[in-house]
């Protein structure tokens, strides 16, 4: 273990009493908004897991997506949040047995290898390290650390990601709004804004979205919407209008309902693409598999429940799909995944002796 260039982050290891006899694992969920690190003790593998789970510490930091803030800033954020979690738990790096880092922007083996190399400079050589996309943490939060099934994330963006028990994986969507993340919060809201402009021009039908969106944004006319949109076209800012679209659909607006119905079809098609490529449904199309559903777009509303409608579409083709809404956050899922993978490797090493 080298003294990393950010060695001052770890100064607490020399200043506090550490419970070195208590082995721990770290689970990280890193995204464009925030990064969460969970520190948990090593637990004997059991079914079911203890409830509540014994979380020793939780730490939060900023963005850790290297595509958004650059590699140096992303590394510093990840290292700081891990140090904070260990400090809060009264542990240090010598107590760590496994780390699962699930972060957005890790989409290629070269991304994984770059982060693994950096992590190896921080932790002792015996620590097991696992680097994944943040969708994996979301899946593990629903399966309690088991890497099997499909996860559908629909928040500002969207992605469907699946794994088989023999290690195969596949994804659909998740390419960003320019390449068509329709069904995401950004996609839904962008279509609503487009509908308002079309109605204003006379190229589209009248819609309640016009008055409701203008009122929400405190604008006096649809012409002002153009300036508002391009003043800051950030994905999250646009996606924040989704509740307005849902409320208009619930009030019976045809245009808003059409937008949401198309979003449901897009989200369902992403899941179906992953299920088909991996054969999660079995040869007969009826086999059980967990479908973890995460993100604000999929949360239940008064009458227009997008998540429920997506599940209705999927169930017609795959009756074995079981919808799961996680009870723990993705960082806990990452920690449980680290625990499961660590235990598997321990068993394999024991058999080789």
What are these model-derived regions, one by one?
Residues 81, 97, 103-107:
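Membrane helical hairpin/interfacial module
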Residues 102-106, 154, 251, 315:
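N-terminal loops that bind phosphate or other acidic moieties
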Residues 102, 132, 292-294:
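Solvent-exposed beta-strand sheet faces enriched in polar/charged residues
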Residues 30, 103, 135:
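Residues immediately flanking
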Residues 100, 173-176, 305:
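Short acidic, glycine/Ser/Thr-rich loop/turn "cap" segments at secondary-structure junctions
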């Amino acid at each position: 273990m080298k003294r990393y260039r950010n060695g001052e982050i770890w100064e607490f290891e020399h200043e506090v009493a550490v419970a070195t006899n208590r082995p721990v694992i770290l689970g990280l969920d890193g995204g464009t908004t925030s990064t969460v690190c969970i520190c948990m003790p090593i637990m004997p593998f059991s079914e079911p897991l203890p409830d509540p789970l014994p979380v020793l510490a939780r730490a939060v930091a900023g963005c850790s997506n290297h595509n958004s803030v650059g590699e140096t800033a992303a590394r510093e954020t990840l290292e700081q949040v891990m140090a904070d979690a260990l400090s809060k738990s009264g542990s240090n790096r010598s107590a760590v047995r496994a780390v699962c880092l699930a972060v957005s922007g890790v989409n290629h083996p070269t991304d994984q290898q770059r982060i693994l190399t950096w992590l190896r400079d921080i932790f002792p050589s015996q620590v097991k390290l696992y680097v994944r996309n943040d969708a994996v943490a979301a899946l593990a939060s629903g399966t309690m650390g088991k890497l099997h099934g499909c996860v559908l994330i629909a928040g500002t963006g969207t992605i469907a990601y699946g794994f088989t028990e023999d290690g195969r994986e596949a994804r659909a969507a998740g390419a960003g709004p320019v390449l068509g993340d329709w069904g995401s919060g950004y996609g839904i809201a962008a279509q609503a804004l487009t509908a308002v402009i079309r109605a204003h021009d006379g190229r589209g039908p009248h819609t309640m979205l016009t008055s409701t969106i203008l009122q929400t944004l405190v604008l006096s006319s649809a012409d002002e919407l153009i300036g508002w949109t391009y003043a800051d076209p950030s994905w999250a800012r646009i996606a924040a209008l989704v509740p307005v679209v849902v409320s208009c659909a619930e009030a019976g607006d045809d245009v808003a309902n059409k937008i949401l119905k198309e979003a449901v079809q897009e989200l369902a098609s992403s899941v179906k693409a992953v299920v088909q490529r991996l054969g999660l449904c079995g040869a007969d199309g009826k086999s059980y598999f967990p479908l973890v559903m995460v993100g604000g777009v999929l949360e239940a509303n008064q009458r227009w429940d997008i998540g429920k409608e997506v599940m209705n579409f999927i169930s017609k083709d795959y009756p074995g799909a079981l919808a799961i809404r996680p009870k723990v956050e993705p960082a806990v899922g990452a920690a449980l995944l680290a625990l499961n993978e660590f235990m598997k490797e321990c068993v394999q090493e024991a058999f080789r002796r």
